[in-house]
Amino acid sequence: MATKHFSFIVVLIFLHLSVTLNAQDDGSYKMPPKAIADMLLAKPSPTVSVDDKGEWMLLTDISLYPSVEELARPEFRIAGMRINPKNYAPSRQNFISNIWLKNIRSGKEYKINGLPSSLFAGSVNWSPNNKKIAFTQTTKDKVDLYVIDVATQKAMKVNKTALNVLRGNYQWYDDNTLLYLTAIRPASIAPPKPLMPKGPTTQENYGKASPRPTFQDLIRSPYDEQLFEFYNTAQLVKNVNGAETKIGQPAIYGSINISPDKKYMLVRTLKKPFSYVVPAQGFPSHIVITDMNGKAVKQLADLPSAETAPGGNDNVQLVPRGFDWRDDEAATVIWCMPLDSGFIKKNVDYHDAVYSLAAPFNNEPLELFKTKMRYRGVTWGNTTLALVNEGLQGKQTTQTNRYNPSTGETEKLMERNTTDAYSNPGFPVTEKNQWGQEVIRLIDNGSKILMNNPTGSSPKGDLPFLASFDLITKKSDIIWRSKEGSFEYVVKLMDADKLELLTRKETEKEVPNYFLKNLKLKLADRQITDFTDPYPQLDNVSKQKIKYKRADGVDLTGDLYLPKGYNANRDGKLPVFIWAYPAEFNSAADAAQVRGSEHRFTLLNWGSAVYYVTQGYAVLNNAEMPIVSTSKEKKPNDDFIQQLTMNAEAAIHVLDSMGVGDRNRVAVGGHSYGAFMTANLLAHTKLFKAGIARSGAYNRSLTPFGFQNEDRTYWQALQLYSDMSPFNYADKIKTPILLVHGEMDNNTGTFPIQSERMFNAIKGHGGTVKYLSLPYESHGYQGRENILHMLNEQFTWLEKYVKNAEKKEEKKAF
């Protein structure tokens, strides 16, 4: 009997192990259906850059999706940076694999001679006179700088010393001169990792509040500090026709900006102590003006670490910020200071003041103007015009003022909600002044400016436009607008007097291409490029922007894709995949606005849900998930779960009522905050058959100083954080959920442990869950094999739990 009993136990153990092992897959990479793989790997249209004169077009091919083997190469992750230890460059880049030129007038294309045989180019920039083009070339052990002569179409390497591009890129000084940072020592002599630390790592705080977000890839040890200093210390060099001259001493540069008259530099250098709490851009720093030989002329600021910056929307450190040169003067630096001790809720008439200091920088700073909200920047024009922007993130408000530099007078031109897309006037059209700086272009004797809006949101969908704005009447007149049935926007104003435009035009069936358009002469549009459709798999797939309402009357939209040849009467209702990302609004009217256009060509990236329309699914992409403040006393997130549920119910209902979506076979998915949304919907409703949640944060106690636009802390809104955390309701998640996360996620708040713990919590309560950890991936995925495997995992999840799910009674929200 004992033997039989023992044998029975062995059989049970074997069966248990078999089930467990089968659930783990075999660990190898899988491919999705061919149509999906072909679309992912399709060669995209070239990227385009046009010179200032509108004569030449530079076209480039970008290599997407490197192999996982490339991602697996060594890297240091320190101070918010990811460093290639061999070449003083970022470790993760998408490189340009081909460069060529096209004459816009003739349409003739030109091959570039002298390019490296294996091109890994980046940072392409035109020279001031548009006769040359510079780019970087990255190899395994160094970064070089090349210059293309546009007239001869020849490229030549111009540097003698390898570049260091970790703390900034090269800049054109003039048509024959470039400034760049160089490596000061071979990467091969980087500090070796000690066999053991000298002692424990210690962090301290003595009475100062430091409410910082949960940044990733931070400095964690004295060895990290050594590496940061080694790799980021660089020598500034001036290169004149290939001859290099050192400028100043090696330093850890934060930024280098050349004055419009080319006589000075505005330099920020980082200094110790290096922070273990914030990334490099938050380290202590010096702000100084130097001459072009690197000699200090004026010390402007000695800034502390950002560790003690106050938390909350629109709060800032009590230090000068926003240092920059005025574009309309030879050498005048400007900056901003808070007038409210850095706290926006302080009751003061003005919250910021902007100051200036002109060369030779030996006078007292001059106050230019004050702002009633937070200063957001200025666009310079001439001696009588500049446009000053101010706003409040917390109140979703922005304001543009006219500033007269000669008199100091300011006048409000417009104020709007940042979420009110319909009222967005666009941005000013600029032109280059005598110093080669972009300044506002004025028309009609200086009474009007041109405004370009490449989105052009409207109740009919996005219709980009070019308008004139009257500075006196404060009214806009549309000069040109994209025709309904297409999506076309102004890329460049080629000739303002003739109103000759370079535009980019597309429809839902026609790939984006570039056109020359003459509004005054009303000539027929001339097509400049002839890019072809990379996705024949989507031919005859239908796309429409659908409009519907949720229970409280808020209007919603989404982009509905239906399979090729689908007929609702013949084929019946389809399984549905809804992809979304929540957004907060203070205004229900703003939330209800139409966003996007059904007439845009569908361009796919690695994260798209549209792939699955080729596999027989109705895909509702960009399904709107607004979270709206319901009163002045409430913030949007106070009703997060209820509004999320209403949004989902409305989407399912409209697809069901249209006769295209089977409400009993619906999946929901999202990335990042969309993953957070997905987990919450599965925790609090019974609307879905499955969920796909990628790179999300599920436990809000791990993001205690705010997330997204929520600026209340965990301790100020403990119940809110608890209610919004799907981790706290993991025992309620019985709907199958696929969790995906990059194992090296570098996004604030979305540490991989969020998905790891969510998986364990759901598993521990008997839920159906799978966790896919993608090796070497960040918050956005890059590795070819990883992405193909992820697309296949999503496909098999949808097939198993949605398309082929057993039909049950109609799904209810609760």
What are these regions (language model features)?
Residues M1-D25, E743:
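Bacterial Sec-dependent N-terminal signal peptides
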Residues Y581-N586, S597:
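Active-site glycine-rich loops that stabilize anionic/oxyanionic intermediates
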Residues F95-S97, I104, S597-F814:
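Active-site-proximal cap/loop segments of hydrolase catalytic domains
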Residues T529-G572:
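N-terminal cap/lid segment of alpha/beta-hydrolase-fold proteins
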Residues I287, V333, L413, Y514, ...:
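Conserved hydrophobic/aromatic pocket- or pore-lining residues that grip, position, or stack substrates
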Residues H16, L21-A524, D530-N540, D555, ...:
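Beta-propeller folds
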Residues D571-A583:
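Short beta-strand element of the alpha/beta-hydrolase
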